[in-house]
Design a protein with these regions (language model features):
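Phosphate/adenylate-binding glycine loop and adjacent helical scaffold
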Residues: 1-104, 134-137, 141
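C-terminal accessory module of base-excision DNA glycosylases/AP lyases that mediates lesion recognition
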Residues: 1-30, 102-145, 149-242
Length: 242
């Protein structure tokens, strides 16, 4: 499972023998792919952020460093990292005249990058904790328990189409701040500004049970929508074949 998700096994080490940094970087790289694969794809004639590999590597390095040095209030840390990704000079080429249709980093993409990084770090910890047989694993477990575990109730829910679909079915009223009125539909998460994200995330956390971890709620909800989508595809194929 870990190899499929992040191309790691439980005994992996980086070239410097630092398993903690190695595992964090693998999680960050997978999260970057999740956040950018569909909305930052290369296209001729576009000023796309993904065209420059330096941008990608700088962003990944930044998040790896921030995770290793996480401290203080989680909300402040999260906002700081998202803004650094978004507003840092690596994404702000002053010689480029960006247009609305150009696919570049938004706060919506930054949040998914950061939030999926955390989600993958939680997955790594959960698996390693259940299979604690290797020194490299124990080093990562110690890092997580010292630096991240205390924030588990504060972790943000990664916002994507699956979460928006779930909310639109049962709690549509909390989408009011991200509705594009002239189009009468929800703004794509990849286009969200900071205020869009903050207001929605705050409302989203009210949905879960008080003692439920945000990422537990997200995982359960995401799977429900994934199953629903798959069932619709199967039903469509069956009805069209008869």
């Amino acid at each position: 499972m870990l190899y499929t998700l992040m191309e790691v096994t439980l005994n992996d080490l980086d070239k410097d023998g630092n398993p903690v940094k190695y595992y964090i970087e693998k999680a960050v790289r997978r999260a970057y792919r999740d956040a950018s694969s569909h909305v930052l794809s290369i296209e001729e004639g576009k000023n796309d952020s993904k065209k420059n590999p330096f941008i990608k590597e700088t962003a990944i390095s930044k998040v790896v460093d921030e995770v290793q040095n996480i401290s203080g209030d989680y909300e402040c840390w999260h906002k700081h990292v998202c803004k650094d990704i978004l507003m840092g000079e690596i994404y702000q080429d002053k010689n480029v005249d960006y247009k609305e249709e150009d696919r570049r980093f938004s706060y919506g993409i930054a949040q998914k990058f950061v939030n999926m990084t955390i989600k993958y770090l939680v997955i790594l910890y959960t698996v390693m904790k259940a299979m604690d047989t290797d020194k490299a694993n124990r080093n990562y477990i110690k890092f997580y328990e010292k630096n991240l575990k205390k924030y588990e109730q504060d972790f943000h829910i990664p916002i994507d189409g699956y979460i928006l679909e779930s909310v639109s079915k049962d709690k549509a009223e909390i989408l009011k701040n991200v509705i594009v009125k002239e189009k009468k539909k929800v703004k794509a998460w990849s286009k969200w500004e900071e205020n869009d994200y903050n207001s929605f995330q705050a409302e989203l956390k009210k949905i879960k049970a008080k003692d439920e971890y945000p990422l537990d709620w997200e995982g359960k909800t995401w799977i429900e929508i994934a199953k629903s989508r798959k069932e619709k595809i199967i039903y469509k194929k069956l009805t069209h074949s008869t």
